[in-house]
Every structure is written in C-alpha cells, then in structure tokens.
C-alpha cells in the first residue's frame, strides 16, 4: 500500500498565493514552495490576494481546508498585510481570535498548525534599513503562538535580513519592478514593493523552509535543496 503523502496547506494573502499568468512574473512564495520538497509532500495553496484572517474564514476558505486536511498534515498560516486595513482585524483581539480558529481547525484534524509572521514590505529608510510597516500584527501572532504552543516562523525578521542584504537597489529584483515596455505584462511599467518576482518568491520560500528546519518540525526531513539533493 502506498504511503499517504503529507499535505502542506497554506493560508495567507497575495504574498503567498498563486498568481495568474497575466501577472507573471509576479508570484507568491506558496507558488514555488512545492519545489523545495521531495515527492511525498503535496503543497495545497489556498492563499488568496487581499485575504485577511476574517475574510479567509468568512469566504469559506478555512472550511475548504478543514474538509481535506488530515492526521499528520500541516497548515502554515501567514496573515497581517490585509488585517491592517479597515475591513481587517485588531491585533490583540480579533486577529488573535481568528488565528486561534485556524490553529484549532488543524489540531481537530490531527494536523500541525504553524504560524508565519508577515513578509516585510520593501520600504527602506535613508540608512538602507527596512522600515517596519506591519504594526503590532507580527508581535500579536508571536504572543499567541507562545500561548497556544504553536510553532512560529518569523518571516518578518527573515525577510528584513534578506532585503537589507540585497540593498535598496538590488532588492528591486525580488519584487515586481519594471520600466515601461520592459515586460509585456506591464507595458506601463510597475513599482511594486509588496509582491514578489519569481526570484523573490523562491528566496522567501527558502526562508520558510529554513524556518521549518530551525523549528525541527518532522516536515524538515522531506525538504530538498534547489539542486534536488536531500538536505544534510
């Protein structure tokens, strides 16, 4: 009998989601995440552009995950960008309440919830440092993770280091930045400091994989390097 594949469900916003071909090379990190795993792992990307914790639940997206997630699967949960907006949530009340619902949904099915703090936006100060634009949401998530004993990957901190390593100019390559007529999908040009290019999406996906390893989650044994060799 074939062993059941491990499913890794992703709940999040546009920085995680699969982007349509007409937006290429825009990509969420979830779009390329499956490339980092061996064959026994299936990534199920339920992330959606514009999603906040509350809209994701209200649109039935968490319910759709609940119907398919099973014992031993994983649910990675990254929200914050849209929870900041007026139609979103408050960090230490409704945001945490909805995150708790995500964690409980996974655990009720015998699956493992993992919180992931939001990716930073590409906003540099005059000293070449990334400015924090996510308010209290990442800290609220980390506080709740401690309370619920849910592992957390601090992608906020990891992306800050990544962007600063590239610097203000080179980091544009991680995002959807084009001059007019440089790319057929963006004839008028675009300067997007939130959404990733395919290169950026893969860099960020690798940071999530790094977080899985650092936490010592059993899922780490199924990670492969980009060259296709098992991680040592």
From Swiss-Prot:
pH-activity dependence text: Optimum pH is 8.5. The enzyme is more active in the 7.5-9.0 range, achieving a sharp decrease in the activity below pH 7.0.
Family annotation (InterPro entries): RhgT-like, SGNH_hydro, SGNH_hydro_sf
Regulation: Almost completely inhibited by diethylpyrocarbonate at 5 mM and completely inhibited by phenylmethylsulfonyl fluoride (PMSF) at 50 mM. Dimethyl phosphite achieves only a 53% inhibition. Also inhibited by metal ions (magnesium, manganese and calcium) and chelating agent (EDTA) at the same level.
Gene3D superfamilies the record matches: SGNH hydrolase
GO molecular function: hydrolase activity
Keyword Hydrolase: yes
Signal peptide boundaries: none
Induction comment: Up-regulated by growth on type I rhamnogalacturonan.
E.C. number(s) listed in UniProt: 3.1.1.-
Domain of life: Bacteria
Positions of the catalytic residues: 14, 191, 195
Keywords: Hydrolase
Temperature profile: Optimum temperature is 35 degrees Celsius. The enzyme is quite thermostable in the range of 35 to 40 degrees Celsius, and suffering a decrease in thermostability above 45 degrees Celsius.
Protein family (similarity comment): Belongs to the 'GDSL' lipolytic enzyme family.
Cited function: May play a role in the degradation of type I rhamnogalacturonan derived from plant cell walls. This enzyme has a broad substrate specificity, and shows strong preference for glucose pentaacetate, beta-naphthylacetate, and p-nitrophenyl acetate (pNPA). Also active toward acetylated xylan.
Summary of subunit composition and partner proteins: Monomer.
The protein's name in its UniProt record: Rhamnogalacturonan acetylesterase RhgT
Organism the protein comes from: Bacillus subtilis (strain 168)
């Amino acid at each position: 009998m074939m062993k059941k594949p491990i499913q890794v469900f992703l709940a999040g916003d546009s920085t995680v989601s699969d982007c349509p071909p007409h937006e290429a090379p825009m990509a969420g990190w979830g779009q390329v995440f499956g490339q980092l795993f061996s064959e026994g792992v299936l990534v199920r990307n339920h992330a959606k552009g514009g999603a906040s914790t509350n809209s994701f639940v209200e649109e039935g997206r968490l319910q759709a995950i609940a119907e398919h997630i099973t014992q031993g699967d994983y649910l990675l949960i990254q929200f914050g960008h849209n929870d900041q907006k007026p139609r979103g949530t408050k960090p230490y009340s409704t945001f945490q309440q909805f995150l708790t619902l995500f964690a409980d949904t996974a655990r009720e099915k015998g699956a493992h919830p993992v919180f992931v703090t939001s990716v930073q936006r590409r906003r540099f100060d005059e000293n070449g440092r990334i400015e924090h634009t996510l308010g209290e949401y990442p800290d609220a998530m980390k506080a709740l993770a401690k309370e619920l004993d849910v592992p957390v990957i601090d992608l906020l901190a990891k992306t800050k280091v990544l962007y600063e390593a590239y610097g203000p100019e080179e980091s544009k390559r991680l995002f959807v930045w084009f001059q007019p007529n440089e790319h057929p999908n963006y004839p008028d040009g675009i300067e997007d400091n939130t959404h990733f290019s395919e290169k950026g999406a893969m860099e960020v996906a690798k940071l999530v994989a790094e977080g899985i390893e650092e936490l010592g989650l059993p899922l780490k044994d199924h990670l492969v390097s980009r060259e296709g060799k098992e991680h040592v």
